[in-house]
């Protein structure tokens, strides 16, 4: 069953100014508070997408949009890049397949890093939407989970960026 998000309110505590974002299912704030990233979803999928907000200017960027689930959004501690998984390419199919993406705040679009069949993902395994993602301290590597169709999970390091 597709979930529908709720309203997220971003309030500047000094000025009291509020900005509201509809259909939010998950959100993440960078450690320095300068970047807010959120996933949106609506029952009819028209609002589905992943968005980034500069909290100082309130400028918004659509990272990736379209009918899908956007999960495991992970910001690097500096807030200048993120990784996430989505089933955008298989949304609505009986068997959902997730793809790992990487995005930098200055990039126009995210980069596809891994999915079923890519180098670094063992044969018969695919990107899992259940495991956590993590960045290395320097932000040059991403740690991801991949799983077999049986549901067994195994940690793999993916250095293809």
Where are these regions (language model features)?
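Hydrophobic, small-residue-rich alpha-helical packing segments that form membrane-like cores
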Residues: 51, 55, 76-78
């Amino acid at each position: 069953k597709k979930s529908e998000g709720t309203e997220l309110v971003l309030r500047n505590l000094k000025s009291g100014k509020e900005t509201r974002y509809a259909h939010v299912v998950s959100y993440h704030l960078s450690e320095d508070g300068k970047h807010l990233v959120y996933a949106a979803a609506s029952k009819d999928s028209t609002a589905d997408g992943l968005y980034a907000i500069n909290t100082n200017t309130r400028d918004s960027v659509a990272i990736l949009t379209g009918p899908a689930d956007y999960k495991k959004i992970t910001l690097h501690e500096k807030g200048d890049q993120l990784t996430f998984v989505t089933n955008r390419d298989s949304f609505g199919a009986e068997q959902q397949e997730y793809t790992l993406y990487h995005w930098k705040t200055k990039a126009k679009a995210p980069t596809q890093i891994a999915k079923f069949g890519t180098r670094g993902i063992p044969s018969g395994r695919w990107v899992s939407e259940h495991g956590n993602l993590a960045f290395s301290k320097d932000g040059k590597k991403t740690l991801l989970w991949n799983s077999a169709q049986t549901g067994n999970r195994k940690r793999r390091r993916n250095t293809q960026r």
